Amino acid sequence: MSDSSEATVKRPLDAHVGPSENAAKKLKIEQRTQADGIHEADVGITLFLSPELPGFRGQIKQRYTDFLVNEIDQEGKVIHLTDKGFKMPKKPQRSKEEVNAEKESEAARRQEFNVDPELRNQLVEIFGEEDVLKIESVYRTANKMETAKNFEDKSVRTKIHQLLREAFKNELESVTTDTNTFKIARSNRNSRTNKQEKINQTRDANGVENWGYGPSKDFIHFTLHKENKDTMEAVNVITKLLRVPSRVIRYAGTKDRRAVTCQRVSISKIGLDRLNALNRTLKGMIIGNYNFSDASLNLGDLKGNEFVVVIRDVTTGNSEVSLEEIVSNGCKSLSENGFINYFGMQRFGTFSISTHTIGRELLLSNWKKAAELILSDQDNVLPKSKEARKIWAETKDAALALKQMPRQCLAENALLYSLSNQRKEEDGTYSENAYYTAIMKIPRNLRTMYVHAYQSYVWNSIASKRIELHGLKLVVGDLVIDTSEKSPLISGIDDEDFDEDVREAQFIRAKAVTQEDIDSVKYTMEDVVLPSPGFDVLYPSNEELKQLYVDILKADNMDPFNMRRKVRDFSLAGSYRTVIQKPKSLEYRIIHYDDPSQQLVNTDLDILNNTRAKESGQKYMKAKLDRYMPDKGGEKTAVVLKFQLGTSAYATMALRELMKLETSRRGDMCDVKENI
């Protein structure tokens, strides 16, 4: 763009198609049904920054390995999986003759053993001679016995346990029965000794197990490499296997489900050996790169993410300009001018009814309507849930619908379970209060997601209007972050329930740009932010934009200056988000291929496995030692992009600006196949 301050904008429909095709598309949009799902315009995504540049057609996420995400930590380091933990020390293998000789020696030692006379006398006073002889026999023969006497006093029992350990050199195990007698058996001295020797090899200077990773501390940080799973799902698997509560695991940000991702995770109150052992059972996930830390990770503890994206089946629809020229010019514009930092379509769900629509009803305290929207029989829902939705629509029998609802439908299950345990009114319906109770049974992070989606819809709509009115030109009344104000926006918030973009904004304030700021070139368009509606944000002093907040919320029977609610979860403080994002370190490659199932980029795990194989002299694939697979030619064309984005920015919005395509689930850019 020759003059970035005079940005022109068009709706996505007009980006790179001819007039006749454009008219056909407009007609198609007017005639679309619920089956089409949510489209960009439904959630405020309407403009491009560089509409004059041609885009290209292609599809993302045909395979989950087409979308790689690596977290960037607060020091700017890109997180990669470079090891798969450590191997536990192996017990030395011994011959059968050695084992038998050791057993014979051990048996002879036990036969010759005599309890210290003074300690034996104490045992006789407690148990009697007959039981002491039986205890000595247990020591020598590995039998078991139970004492004749019982001992009611706990302090006495404790002393007896200690006396037995002392008398028999910790080689007997004693337990108290329900009747307060003692059951005594011989412990396995060899296994205990070997275990202790193994542990001693892996302790730090303070005697704490560390497996060679330095001084032990309260938290273990590790890299999580996952495939085709979202972060919450992966964390739930780990906590279930370790049998620990979810609160002991923290992470800086959630990562895409349909992707291969790497991120740092912290865990507390768990041994490193137990954590490391997970790699034997994890599927589609692997952990490694451990280190000890004094502090846990928290949401927002990252600078952003690095993306490697494969766009397959690329065509231009333009015979006058080469693909190389289109991609080159598009990437240049994207690097220099950026893209509108819209909340992406992922924010609004994949069902026919957008999450922001449900969020609106929650903010209006329309509990029944919100619940009915969640449970409604829609065209675009999880297919396995359609029978349950049909039952609910026809019978309002919560218990019957619950039996058919798939467990993975968390919100629906919570609603139906709660309603099935409540009484109906005389007319056979549930009360508004019953629906409210059911809504509050939805996991908190999920029910707050709905209202955050509504905030995102408003933000997108305002951002489109801001660019439409003023392009990339800074104007008086725009908002920028006030770096002199360090006080938090809100206090006492549990960060487990907030997205990384919301969490980050809790610690910043904004101020309005003045004419003096503009004259001194103190700020650029990259500094401009817009608030999502809330009770603790500053709205733009530009009257047009401020009025737009009023108009949008008024249409939904709300007031941007009154966002507090009686229900704390739905009382929104608001947050700030930059209007423009510029990808960093943007590079591209054009690759040709034939097989649609051919993997075109390598994951961290691919690279690690083949690098290790090469170093150990084993068979390896040379093509899998680097991120990019070699171009072997073919009739199909793919564009591979690599770039970095800041916290909470959506890679699909950067791709949208480059390709000039609709990013909704049923749009031209997406061809989602769930398991490849």
UniProtKB/Swiss-Prot annotation:
Region (Disordered): 1-27, 87-110
Database matches in PROSITE patterns: TRUD, UPF0024
Pfam families (UniProt xref): TruD
Protein name: Multisubstrate pseudouridine synthase 7
Protein keywords: Acetylation, Cytoplasm, Isomerase, mRNA processing, mRNA splicing, Nucleus, Ribosome biogenesis, rRNA processing, tRNA processing
Record note on what altering residue 305 to A does: Strongly decreased pseudouridylate synthase activity
Residue positions of the active site: 256 (nucleophile)
UniProt feature, compositional bias: Basic and acidic residues: 94-110
N-acetylserine PTM sites in chain numbering: 2
Function: Catalyzes pseudouridylation at position 35 in U2 snRNA stem-loop II region which induces particular conformation of the mRNA-U2 snRNA duplex and places the nucleophile in an accessible position for the first step of splicing. Also catalyzes pseudouridylation at position 56 in U2 snRNA. Also catalyzes pseudouridylation at position 50 in 5S rRNA, position 13 in cytoplasmic tRNAs, and position 35 in pre-tRNA(Tyr).
Isomerase keyword on record: yes
NCBIfam families: tRNA_TruD_broad
Residues annotated as signal peptide: none
Documented EC number(s): 5.4.99.-, 5.4.99.27
Gene Ontology cellular-component annotations: box H/ACA snoRNP complex; cytoplasm; nucleoplasm; nucleus
Subcellular location: Nucleus; Cytoplasm
Catalytic reaction list: uridine in 5S rRNA = pseudouridine in 5S rRNA; uridine in snRNA = pseudouridine in snRNA; uridine(13) in tRNA = pseudouridine(13) in tRNA; a uridine in mRNA = a pseudouridine in mRNA
Gene Ontology MF term list: pseudouridine synthase activity; RNA binding; snRNA pseudouridine synthase activity; tRNA pseudouridine(13) synthase activity
